[in-house]
Amino acid sequence: MATIHIESLKEDIAPIVLMPGDPLRAKYIADNFLTDVKLVNKVRNIFAYTGYYNNKRVTVFSSGMGIPSMGIYAYELYKFYDVKKIIRIGTCGTVNKNVKLLDVILATSSYSLSTFPLLFDLDTGKEYFSSVLLNKKIKDVALAMNINIKSGEIITSDVFDPYVDHEKFISNFPDKRFLASEMEAFVLFYLAYKLNREASTL
């Protein structure tokens, strides 16, 4: 069963999806970390691959950049492909002095001024949360691999904030102490909440 934006059959997609923004990063992950890999989507050059990691079937599916693109792919994967868990794996920026280059951040929630929830279902929430259970699994694996993780709230923005005035950007969030800013996690967490699925963001 294909959708408007995804050509895959339902059985092509694993219940667990890793979701980088960049299609070429999805290809890199598939080429270097998965075995028995199959290309399952290339519509609009949004590449997706399904294969095995440590004998666990997983799909790596690129989201593109920004809330609208993530909203399309996360919704279709959750709704029509019966995906249970999506873990966004991507880059972010920060103005937090405690966060250093190459630190790994696990988002416990995302705050945004996006109108996506309002337009989607008249929801007015500005903050949505990642899966506590999925986050615990991620932390447990990181601990076992001796990888330090910083966890906390992030901001999801509709603009690429390095291009705008820093002080003006920060003034939109006067009461927030966030670890990082990025452009996709908010809608992923929102759709997981609406569709009773799980989501995390690294």
Residue locations for each model-derived region?
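Active-site nucleophile and cofactor-binding loops and adjacent substrate-binding regions
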Residues: 63, 178-183
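Zn-dependent metallopeptidase/amidohydrolase metal-coordination segment
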Residues: 186-202
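Short glycine/serine/threonine-rich phosphate/pyrophosphate-binding segments
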Residues: 68-71, 183-188
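Metabolite-binding pocket within alpha/beta catalytic cores that recognizes anionic/polar moieties
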Residues: 1-128, 132-134
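Short glycine/serine/threonine/alanine-rich loop segments
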Residues: 56, 147, 197
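Short acidic/polar active-site loop segments enriched in Thr and Asp
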Residues: 83-84, 179, 198
